[in-house]
Amino acid sequence: MKARLPKEYQNRGANNMNSMIKQAQKMQEDIERVKAELEARDFTASAAGGMIEVTMSGAKVLKEVKLNPEVVDKDAIEDLQDVIVAGVNAVITQIEEVSAAEMEKVTGGVNIPGLV
């Protein structure tokens, strides 16, 4: 005699698999949406005590560098270059932190390598 499950339990494994696939597809759609939203945003950060302000897009494209007039000195080119590097790095760090936080909301904290 063959044991049979009641109808409500039949195909339960297939339903769970379909549910998991739909959930993964929705997560992928949410990830793409959040990525697009982040890339459309602008991020601004300052460095060196406000001597430089840098604006980048969420796609990490440098859009604007504002220097405090006190910074510009022909004899201080190396200092100016260091300040610009610090400003760019500060805004990239800001973008990465916000991106990671937004993606964590979508993935529920699951670490997906290469996502951000």
Task: List each model region and its residues.
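Long amphipathic alpha-helical segments used for membrane anchoring, targeting, substrate engagement
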Residues: 1-39, 44, 94-116
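Residues at secondary-structure transition points
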Residues: 15, 71-82, 86
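Residue-level signature of catalytic and energy-coupling elements of molecular machines
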Residues: 24, 60, 84
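N-terminal intrinsically disordered, cationic/polar leader segments
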Residues: 40, 46-61
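A short interface-forming secondary-structure element
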Residues: 49, 62-77
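Conserved beta-strand segments that form the floor/walls of ligand-binding pockets within enzyme
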Residues: 55, 66, 111
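Stable alpha-helical structural segments in soluble proteins, enriched in small hydrophobic residues
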Residues: 83, 87-95
